[in-house]
Amino acid sequence: MSKKQGARARIPIVMCIDIEPDERVFDPYQPKDWLGFQAGWEPLQHWRTSLSLATGSPAHFNWFVRIDPQIEYSYGAADWAITRYHPCFAAMLRAGDEIGLHPHAWRWREPERRWVSDFGDQAWIEHCVQQGFTHFERRFNRPCRSFRFGDRWLNNQTVTLLERLGAKFDLTIEPGRKREELSESFTGVLPDYTGAQRHPYRPAAADFLQRGDWSSRRDLWHIPISTASPLWDCSLLSRIRVARARFELGHSPRTVVW
């Protein structure tokens, strides 16, 4: 971006907040309020004010709510959170925030009395996604535009479904994450994101991890989230902090989304 008449380059920042239960696995017959979300709500509103004052621009947050079979089975309604925290969602809408979906693939197995992330069953995955979009549109009177699948899980079939359902932005991909196992029970495999793109892109229809050309790309955008290894050398982190501080002296973000 060129600088004219003292104008400075502006850096948009997208920051995601997942609205979900405190525990990944819990007793579905004794569901609890989501205390983490409750505790973070007011501080984030103070942050909104501070960020707006610091940048001279409105700060809009990006919220991704759990609407999926685990919530339905445990709380009696897949969209329970929107009812339970209705004042918060009303405030998000008034503030012009983005609200999207963050479903997980948990399935309750009663004989074993345990939750299983059933990534290996594509029909179940599509049920989780479809359920979320259906309830979202009913509650907000519009299609869901933004999406983040739980546990960074994604595949081409699901991206095709997201596009068909009207999603415009997917924020699932975590670049650098290797194919690994969860600590809880699951089926299937998690994606390998070691070679994933780190900048927003429209994916190729045949491979959601590849940038598509003009003739084969999807309408949907992938926005990979920022990732870093906790094993980075401290001296490297120090150099990054210094470089960032120098950079920020001449740049300020226009819009901040948490």
Predicted features by range, described:
Residues 14-24, 63-68, 101-109, 223-228, ...:
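Short loop/turn segments at strand-loop or loop-helix junctions that form parts
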Residues 23-35, 117, 241-256:
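A solvent-exposed, charged loop/short amphipathic helix patch at secondary-structure junctions
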Residues 2-91, 95:
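Active-site beta->alpha N-cap acidic-glycine motif
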Residues 2, 149-258:
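Active-site-adjacent pocket scaffolds in enzyme catalytic domains
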Residues 59-61, 65-153, 218:
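Metal-dependent polysaccharide deacetylase catalytic core of the NodB/CE4 family, i.e.
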